[in-house]
Structures are given as structure tokens and as C-alpha cells.
């Protein structure tokens, strides 16, 4: 994509680019979990929608179930990219991106390799350990942007020490992201839902695998969905790529597979309530103003769900069949309760960070291209 300008918030950054816009995504990946991958996929899809000729590339664990039949170019590595620094460095050298986005993945050597090629470097953290890593001085000197993948009211604002470090170095730019919503894909959603129609309840338990630090599984969500359907409501269960268990489908309960972010957004928007885990999809649903019943499914999620409940933004029942079922039925049967919960969600003010992030990626790519052009002339 030979661009003469990037359109960004605040005007046009004029920038002659001698080569295509190239963005490399390095999300943590593996046989279980997919939140980081899903966020990176949404960003990549949105970049392609805004700049159709953009070149994207991913580095993914070859055993990740979503790595099969992925619609963006990808290099598959034998473990999570954090453990494959040599392979990541090789991809950086060959692909020569203007922007590299590490999402909870990467080691110092990979970040340095990106800087050496002239790329701008973004790091996304969603857990305390990764946030701590990104606030080490040697990493702060390598990063242009540090995105914390939850709002400050949930993740906690910058601490005194973090603020002092930012003031000392003057970098990186720190951003708290409420969530990243993929552009809506109405045709894909309609294809998925076919003759079933839009559901009363959308169930999204995550990537489909069980986490080692939790007894809760996606199968529990499927059983709850079947129970809700038995009360006469239409329920759609989004089976993540690692979900292999069978479910008893009917004219009231359907299982959806290979649901991309744009289709998921439409399904979230059209459902009456959402039964969801405590990961990224919860924040996506809240940004859309949906009434949610949230049940954590991994060790980092209980605190997040509890905080959302404290804000009055979700229903957070005990993870027991009767309690979860009753909360869902209450919201379905009592429209006043559902509307009141939606009003509280809107009052909290969760927002989609995607437009701002796309603008920033465009700005960083322009900066990288300008710096490369200067180096080539000198």
C-alpha cells in the first residue's frame, strides 16, 4: 500500500511511503486460551478494513487450535512466541514491519530486534506480571506504547512508581484500553445463525479449553445454556476453537463454531443477555451496553468479575447451576431488571478503543517510514 497520507484524529499526517504498511502481531498463543489472539485478530481485521493493502503477519504457536485455517499470514513456531525468540527475530528481519505489536508475549531480544529494524514497538499487558515487565526501565526504553488491556477502574491506574518511571524516561505512552471491538460483520453473523434466528441468550465461555487454575469449564456453560433453552428461550453457544465436547442441539439451542470477531460483535449486539466468562469478551459486551451474567473460568478472572459487579455492571452469581440459571432467567423474565442493568453499564462508560488504536498504529507507521527514509538519505 503506497500511501501518501494517513488519516488520523486531528488531521492528516503527510508521509511518503516507499513500501507497504506492514504490521507484525506477536500474541501469546498456545493450546489453551485465545484472548490475546482474538484482540490481535480484531486489530488486524480492522486495519485491513481501513487500509485494504496493509500487510499483516502473525507469529503463532503451531499447536494453537485457531492457527489452523487462519485468514491472515502467519509463521507457526514450536511454542508460544515468548519461548521462540530466535524465530520471532527471524520473522522481524524478513518481514521488516513498521509496527510490531507484542501482546503479553516477547522477550527483550525480540523487542531489541524490532527496534534495530526501525520498527515502532507496542506492548500489550493484561496481567500483573506482564505489566511489571513492561515497566522495567530497560523495556520502557524499547517501547513506544504500553497498552494495558483493561480500563483503569478494573486494572488499577498507574501507581506512584509507574508514574515516576514514566516521568523519568518520558516514554512509552501508556494507554488503558476498555476493550477492542472488531468491525461488525453482519453477513458473517447471518450465515452463522442461518434459520435459527438471533438468540435471546448468547453464551461465550472463551476459547474452549479448561484452564489449569480453575475447575470451571466451557462445558458448564453449555449445560447452563441447555437449561435456559428448556425454559423456552433461544440460546446460542459460541464454541471456541479448542472446544471438542458435544452438546444437545435443538430448535432452542445451537452451537456456533469458527466465530470471528466481527460476527461475534453482531451476535452480542442482537442478543438480549450475555452469559460470559471474565475475559475480554465480557468487556466487549459491556462496551456494547449489554446485560451480562459473568462467571470466571480462569485464575485471573475472579477479581475482574468482582470489580465489574462492584461497579454494578454485571450479575456475578456463585458458579453453581441453580444460581447461574436463576440470574439469567431473572434478566430474561423481568425486562425492568434487564433495562436497569443496561443503564448501569452505560453509566459506567465502557468504550471501544479500536478507533484510537488504529489512528495510533497509522501514526507510528508513518513515523517509522519517515525515519527510515531519513536514514537511507544520510
Tell what function each PLM region has.
Residues 142-207, 240-242:
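A nucleotide-sugar donor-handling region in carbohydrate enzymes
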Residues 350-378:
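C-terminal alpha-helical cap of glycosyltransferases
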